[in-house]
Amino acid sequence: MKQLLDFLPLIIFFTVYKLVDIYTATGALIAATAVQIAILYFVYKKVEKMHLVTFAMVTVFGTLTLAFHDDAFIKWKVTIIYSLFAIALAVSQIMNKSIIKAMLGKELKADDNIWARVTWYWALFFIGCGVLNVYVAFSLPLETWVNFKVFGLTALTLLNTVISVFYIYKHAQPEQDDTAN
């Protein structure tokens, strides 16, 4: 259910955009993200920092989009969020406190150098997606950008996740059997 909840604002944004326009879709995105945060809080009793950052960015850039009736703000939101994620990953790695290791290290045992590579890989991935978003958002029609945001970036993120998981599993430390002798 939590994974479906992560996609709820995106699905609502896309649907409302197709039915109405970018400005109504932006308002719907703000509302859907607020509902997402409320559900996460009441059902799981916890809201992750990533969700809070996303909510803040959606609210700020969505409000600017609506106030100035300029879709450039909502387009920039994607790149700014990805940039913030890349910076957070880079800083966490520089401080030897990998965010990715903190998230997955209990389930997957791997050497610190593997976690460092995966962390840097994700930071570069987010930078690449941010740059790609700027290109698509400001060089191609709005319809193309919306499709790219919803389907392209989602597919790229899923592919990156699969690649990362395979890489970690390939280099994971074997489970130690405490029952042997």
From Swiss-Prot:
InterPro entries: YciB (IPR006008)
Transmembrane annotation, as ranges: 22-42, 50-70, 72-92, 118-138, 148-168
Pfam families: IspA
Top-level taxon of the source organism: Bacteria
Topology relative to the membrane: Multi-pass membrane protein
Keywords tagged on the record: Cell inner membrane, Cell membrane, Membrane, Transmembrane, Transmembrane helix
Keyword ATP-binding in annotation: no
Keyword Cell division: no
Compartments where located: Cell inner membrane
GO CC terms of this entry: plasma membrane
Function (record text): Plays a role in cell envelope biogenesis, maintenance of cell envelope integrity and membrane homeostasis.
Family to which the UniProt record says this protein belongs: Belongs to the YciB family.
Protein name, entry field: Inner membrane-spanning protein YciB
Species per Swiss-Prot/TrEMBL record: Shewanella denitrificans (strain OS217 / ATCC BAA-1090 / DSM 15013)
GN (gene name): yciB
